[in-house]
Amino acid sequence: MAQIKIYGLHDHLNRHRDAISDAIHASAMAALGLPEEKRFHRFCGLDSADFIFPSDRSRRYTIIEVSMFEGRTVETKKDFIRQVFAALADRCGIEPQDVEITIMETPRHNWGIRGVPADELTLTYKVDV
């Protein structure tokens, strides 16, 4: 399970929403082993007054926050990050200089999903990869 928030300027996200979502989810499937149907993305478009960033970033500056179950190896998470950078550049023209990715891991017992704590769910995919 991964819940992903994507922050950027309204106009940028509106133009590239589908491509960004596809790039991130393809990377999550390849690196993290998420199933195709487990796409949980929230786009948070901001006005320029509400999204302040350094001058060495362009108007394509995009912040990606990933909340997911703990259990994946350091190498798996690094692979995911690298794949997201590459996919956003290839599919969306968003250069790595304009992307920041943060991963926050949470024990499954701290998630509630479909009426139960997540550590009581039977998953259709592996987390310990």
Model-found features: residue ranges?
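Interaction-mediating elements
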Residues: 1-129
